[in-house]
UniProtKB/Swiss-Prot annotation:
Record-annotated LisH domain positions: 9-41
Native organism taxonomy: Eukaryota, Fungi, Dikarya, Ascomycota, Pezizomycotina
Function: Positively regulates the activity of the minus-end directed microtubule motor protein dynein. May enhance dynein-mediated microtubule sliding by targeting dynein to the microtubule plus end. Required for nuclear migration during vegetative growth as well as development. Required for retrograde early endosome (EE) transport from the hyphal tip. Required for localization of dynein to the mitotic spindle poles. Recruits additional proteins to the dynein complex at SPBs.
Gene name per UniProt: nmp-1
Keywords assigned by UniProt, alphabetized: Cell cycle, Cell division, Coiled coil, Cytoplasm, Cytoskeleton, Microtubule, Mitosis, Repeat, Transport, WD repeat
InterPro entries reported for this sequence: Dynein_regulator_LIS1, G-protein_beta_WD-40_rep, LIS1_N, LisH, PAC1-like_LisH-like_dom, WD40/YVTN_repeat-like_dom_sf, WD40_repeat_CS, WD40_repeat_dom_sf
Domain notes: Dimerization mediated by the LisH domain may be required to activate dynein.
Protein name in the entry: Nuclear distribution protein nudF-2
GO terms for biological process, alphabetical: cell division; establishment of mitotic spindle orientation; microtubule organizing center organization; microtubule sliding; nuclear migration; vesicle transport along microtubule
Keyword Cytoplasm set for record: yes
Provenance organism: Neurospora crassa (strain ATCC 24698 / 74-OR23-1A / CBS 708.71 / DSM 1257 / FGSC 987)
Family: Belongs to the WD repeat LIS1/nudF family.
């Protein structure tokens, strides 16, 4: 011990041991140790005992805390080393949007909501971002400047989802809520509420404009149904039944022919909405808990996903050949159009809340209640190549990628195309389509964060 501790340190340790044994009601053991160390009772009087009382416990807990900190730092170092090993040179990152990935710190942290943020959505043309919250409001931000533009009030309970889209030249904002309604807002008229769509019998958890349709909107609800609405009339034109529990999320394909939905019944379903009475085209079974989120892969990702599935030639017959789902079972699953799970991505330590495919087709991004944002490389069998460890200070509830700018898009938005949707059906977003390297996330920590190049 003399080789490790100085004489003074050894003496302090001995006294702390005696004080600990005395406090633990082990006087005989304390006396034996005192005798062995030649410490008389006069030397180790009550005042000395008081001084050293609790010292050993404090030292012990300090060691445990330090050990945990070291383990955390080693884990963080491993993540950073992995990111470094897989990093694209900075010069290439700036020039090649197809390879761009978000990195900390965020460009902006947007603060104004008073309760957890549930959803975000980018305007298809302008630098506007909408966020919805459990505080019953929608806030419109300028994501380039990081400034709040306005607060929209109208819902009487939590706002659960928002989306931009609508008829050509007349982009609308849709929102849905726990108050059972969907509301339409006109950005060109100071976000005036132009229509309210009642009809669901329980909370409306997701809403999306259907690309290519111009005036159709799909919603998902806790009443176990999906509904398709005509925004020009406000009428429900189709009701989709099939899920046995709460329908959590919905994602339309790029051409609007298919809709992917997720549910508390542990399944996801792909619907062909071109037929009069849509039924599930395929049911995706495999998750072991509630399926919270989903995304349909863009055609740019087909080659990478086909290789992962062991298919030599990427399919080109459908706009919904591959899909991703995220669940409370902490996993992400990749699926083909036949309902086969081609890969399970494991890495999150809590519920997976949001998914978005990189417009370039190489990556899938996810957010989770573990406070992280993860990037999965589809060219490396879905390997996690980047983790933003503290993307937020609490559960991360949503993620959206800014839509690619289409050169011939009208100034007010074009034909209800959703985030990242290319102009022509089936054509992938490319650098020529001006991929915008901008991502928004929202969290229970009341913050919206903008990650941008």
């Amino acid at each position: 011990m003399s080789q490790i501790l100085t004489s003074r340190q050894a003496d302090e340790l001995h006294r702390a041991l005696i004080a600990y044994l005395t406090a633990a009601n082990l006087p005989n053991t304390a006396a034996a140790l005192r005798e062995e160390l030649n410490l008389s009772e006069e030397v180790f009087d009550p005042a000395t005992a008081k001084k050293y009382e609790g010292l050993l416990e404090k030292k012990w807990t300090s060691v445990v805390r330090l050990q945990k900190k070291i383990m955390d730092l080693e884990s963080r170092n491993h993540i950073l080393q992995s990111e470094l090993d897989n990093a694209t040179p900075t010069s290439r990152q700036n020039k090649d949007p197809v390879a761009w990935l978000p990195r900390a710190p965020p460009r902006h942290t947007l603060q104004s909501h008073r309760d957890p943020i549930t959803c975000v959505a980018f305007h298809p043309v302008f630098s506007s971002l909408a966020s919805g919250s459990e505080d019953q409001t929608i806030k419109i931000w300028d994501w380039e400047l990081g400034e709040l533009e306005r607060t929209i009030k109208g819902h009487t309970k939590a706002v659960l989802d928002v989306d931009y889209g609508g008829p050509r030249g007349n982009t609308l904002l849709a929102s849905c809520s726990s108050d059972l309604t969907i509301k339409l807002w006109d950005p060109l008229d100071s976000y005036k509420n132009i229509r309210t769509l009642p009809g669901h019998d329980h909370s409306v958890s997701a809403v999306r404009f259907i690309p290519g349709s111009g005036n159709l909107l799909v919603s998902a609800s806790r009443d176990k149904t999906l509904r398709i609405w005509d925004v020009s009339t406000g009428y429900c034109v189709k009701t989709l039944r099939g899920h046995a529990e709460w329908v959590r999320d919905v994602c339309p394909s790029l051409d609007g022919k298919y809709i992917l939905s997720t549910s508390d019944d542990y399944t996801s379903r792909l619907w062909d909405v071109t037929i009069t009475n849509p039924e599930p085209k395929v049911t995706l079974i495999g998750h072991e808990h509630v399926v919270l989120c989903c995304a349909i892969a863009p055609p740019a990702a087909y080659q990478n996903l086909a290789a992962m599935a062991g298919i030599k030639k990427p399919p080109a017959t459908s706009s919904a050949e591959f899909m991703a789902t995220g669940s409370r079972d902490k996993s992400i699953r990749l699926w083909d159009a036949r309902g086969t799970c081609i890969k399970t991505l494991v890495g999150h330590d809590n519920w997976v809340r949001g998914l978005v495919f990189h417009p370039g087709g190489k990556y899938l991004l996810s957010v989770s209640d573990d406070k992280t944002l993860r990037c999965w490389d589809l060219t490396q069998e879905g390997k996690c190549v980047k983790t933003i460890g503290d993307a937020h200070g609490h559960f991360v509830q949503c993620i959206k990628w800014a839509p690619s700018v289409i050169k011939d898009a009208s100034v007010n938005g074009d034909n209800g195309e959703p985030n990242g949707t290319p102009k022509k059906g089936g054509a992938a977003a490319t650098p020529e389509a001006q991929i915008r390297c901008v991502i928004a996330t929202g969290s229970v920590d009341l913050n919206v964060r903008i990650f941008a190049n």
